[in-house]
């Protein structure tokens, strides 16, 4: 049974299908932590004025935070707006992470989590989930409490290939057709 983190679905599934393996959809697992990283980036951006250099860098290169660290380029690249201090994606990322300490910490937790998840490293994932996150914001703490609560189902997402992505895609197309077809 594949579901998101909605506890009612999980309770119903465990009661109606006692022998079923419950799996949290991989998209929802990754999204929960990536939303925390995105919100922290926005929070840091709001501490600067719109025309300050850090604000512009955080706004323009936000996708670097979500890119796998192993895929960050260290090769020379020309950047727009004469950002002469940057010579590669790695330089930009280092600058972004130097702006705020908690943003950097959340970034590395995100990278550890995604790496363990993508490599299907169950022990590594358990280690990341069970770390102490008391020094982080409430939203990050809540995220990892949720991960701890549903750890078995998250591990099942690694073990089994099932996903509800196809069903979600069909539902999205149906909603789009209904919206476009009206009027």
Question: Model-found features: residue ranges?
Answer:
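Acidic/histidine-rich catalytic cores and adjacent linkers
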Residues: 2-19, 23, 27-31, 50-183
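Short alpha-helix plus adjacent loop in nuclease-associated cores
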Residues: 29-50
């Amino acid at each position: 049974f594949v579901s998101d983190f909605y506890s009612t679905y999980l309770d119903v599934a465990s009661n109606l299908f006692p022998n079923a393996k419950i799996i949290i959809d991989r998209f929802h697992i990754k999204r929960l932590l990536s939303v925390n990283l995105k919100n922290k980036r926005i929070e840091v951006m709001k501490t600067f004025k719109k025309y300050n250099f850090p604000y512009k860098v955080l706004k323009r290169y936000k996708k670097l935070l979500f890119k796998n660290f192993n895929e960050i380029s260290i090769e020379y690249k020309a950047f727009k707006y004469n950002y002469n201090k940057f010579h590669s994606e790695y330089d930009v990322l280092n600058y972004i992470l130097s702006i705020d300490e908690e943003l950097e910490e959340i970034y590395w937790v995100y990278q550890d989590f995604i790496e363990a998840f993508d490599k299907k490293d169950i022990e590594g994932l358990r280690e990341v989930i069970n770390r102490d996150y008391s020094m982080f914001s409430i939203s990050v703490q809540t995220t990892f409490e949720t991960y701890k609560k549903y750890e078995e189902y998250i591990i099942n997402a690694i073990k089994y290939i099932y996903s509800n992505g196809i069903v979600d895609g069909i539902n999205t197309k149906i909603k789009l057709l209904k919206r476009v077809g009206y009027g």
